[in-house]
From Swiss-Prot:
It comes from the Eukaryota. This is Endoplasmic reticulum lectin 1. SUPFAM superfamilies: Mannose 6-phosphate receptor domain (SSF50911). Residues 152-172 are annotated as: Disordered. Gene3D superfamilies: Mannose-6-phosphate receptor binding domain (2.70.130.10). It comes from Xenopus laevis. The keyword Acetylation does not apply.
Length: 480
């Protein structure tokens, strides 16, 4: 093996240097480039070491000789790099992403995202609309709206030709990715143009890119809407339809190991690195003991009153979470007593629902604190009056013709005064059975079909167990 180039490295900065970007060649040897998007891990196996033959590949010539400030030398073997896309490289003969999304486009379905002022409507494969509704004193409804993009209709022949071209090139082009919560996530783009003219861009038409992202439990929710440049938008949609395509499945990036062998006369690991880690352990020890003590207290005194975070932006599972491991009986009792509350929503506003108590809309800010709007409060008399004029429960027929309760609806009125129509806010809460492999999955969403009149949807497998207890007014009780 030929002599390699050497470069000095201070012990404490060793990790930074190795995880940086190396020159492409050392002493005539071409080395693989390192990327900040792919995680690496340093390992110190000692002088007697055999490169792994399974997993991420290595080549004998892909190495550098590193010399620390203490004149310790190490031969560091660099991986050929894995980015988590190995399965994608296999031949795929299934439907294209466009074909997988085709049922969504043919259903004429729309998704909604409600923010503090604007509501966004994405009718898949057709258009994107941004609007705000207001009612004047005379009950005349004023709508302020902008189309952020529309799909250009094509003749069947043009559409067929374009689809054929797309399928021919799709297997060879790079998959688009977007950084979502620190993870590079693949998406399928759908361009929409010919939106409402933009006065800030010489009346050019607004346009949008709809980014469809795989999520197995999603219901085509709108994850985000962003104006990336003036009158040009990005809309991120979560859908389960793309998950059948290997190139669009989300996978965490694998960790690529860099093996640094000590050369003759050098310790197994650099002395300065050992010293640094020892100092860090001394700092961590008191904190770790305190964390362990807090965790024990939390496990000992934890109750089922902890709110459930639904649609947290700390995950990419918008509108879906997993409830803590409780028995169904406990959960049902606490839910019906109103002491177990659901929290849901993404974006500026979040929502809190406590059964038989209230529905709140709130925003938390680290500087200004928590802003809460009462959307509706529970009063049995008001609900009973509402139930006389509206459908409090809906039925569905099973395969053997038996009718079972599909949804129940409850009225919560007397919310905070609406600035637009000077009427109290109100909300209809729809409780629905959710079939899921996880018995404790729950989905919460909110719609505003009319100004300050809301619909809150709550779906869970637990609700399946109590729907049939609903009386003629839709009121639930603990099942026998």
């Amino acid at each position: 093996m030929r002599r390699s180039d050497r470069f000095p490295c201070a012990g404490a900065s060793l990790l930074v240097v190795l995880c940086g970007v190396f020159p492409s060649s050392f002493g005539g040897r071409t080395l693989p480039g390192l990327s900040d998007d792919i995680p690496f891990r340093l390992k110190w196996p000692g002088p007697d070491f055999t490169l792994p033959t399974a997993g991420i590949p290595y080549k004998e010539e892909n190495y550098i000789i590193m010399t620390t400030a203490d004149q310790e030398t190490y031969k560091c073997m660099l991986p050929l790099m894995a980015n988590g896309n190995e399965e994608e490289d296999r031949e795929y003969k299934g439907p294209s992403p466009g074909e997988l999304l085709d049922p969504l486009f043919k259903l004429s379905s729309c998704s909604y995202r409600i923010e503090s002022y604007w509501t966004y409507e994405v009718c898949h494969g057709k258009y994107i609309r941004q609007y705000h509704e207001e009612k004047e004193a005379g009950q005349k409804l004023n709508i302020q709206e902008y189309y952020l993009g529309k799909t250009v209709k094509k003749s069947p022949s043009e559409a067929g030709e374009n689809q054929e071209d797309k399928e021919r090139t799709e297997g060879h082009k790079d998959i688009h990715t977007k950084n979502i919560e620190g993870q590079m996530t693949p998406y399928y783009p759908v361009e929409m143009t010919n939106g409402t003219p933009c006065s800030l861009k010489q009346n050019q038409a607004r346009s949008s890119t709809v980014m469809y992202i795989c999520h197995p439990e999603a219901k085509h929710e709108i994850l985000s809407v962003a104006e990336i440049t003036t009158c040009e938008y990005e809309v991120v949609i979560l859908t389960p339809l793309l998950c059948n395509h290997p190139k669009y499945k989300f996978r965490p990036s694998p960790i690529n190991d860099i093996f640094c062998q000590s050369m003759p006369g050098s310790p197994l690991r650099p002395q300065s690195l050992e010293k640094l880690e020892h100092q860090q352990e001394e700092i961590k020890s008191p904190l770790k003991a305190k964390e362990e003590e807090q965790q024990l207290l939390k496990e000992k005194f934890s109750t089922i009153h902890k709110p459930v975070t639904v649609g947290s932006q700390q995950q990419v599972t918008v509108g879906t979470t997993h409830i803590s491991r409780l028995t169904d009986e406990q959960l049902i009792k606490e839910f019906l007593s109103g002491s177990y509350c659901f929290h849901g929503g993404v974006g500026w506003w979040k929502y809190e629902f406590c059964y038989g108590k209230y529905v709140h809309q709130y925003h938390e800010d680290k500087d200004t604190g928590k802003t809460t709007v009462v959307v509706g409060t529970w009063k049995a008399e008001e609900h009973l009056d509402w139930a006389k004029k509206n459908l409090a429960k809906a039925y569905m027929s099973t395969a053997d013709g038996v009718q079972t309760v599909k949804t129940v609806s409850h009225f919560y009125g007397g919310g905070d005064l609406c600035e637009v129509n000077e009427q109290p806010r109100q909300v209809v809460v729809k409780l629905k059975c959710k079939q899921s492999e996880s018995p404790h999955a729950v989905t919460v969403y909110m719609l505003e079909p009319q100004t300050c009149q809301y619909i809150l949807g709550v779906e869970s497998p637990v609700i399946c167990k109590i729907l049939d207890t609903a009386d003629e007014n839709g009121l639930l009780s603990i099942p026998n």
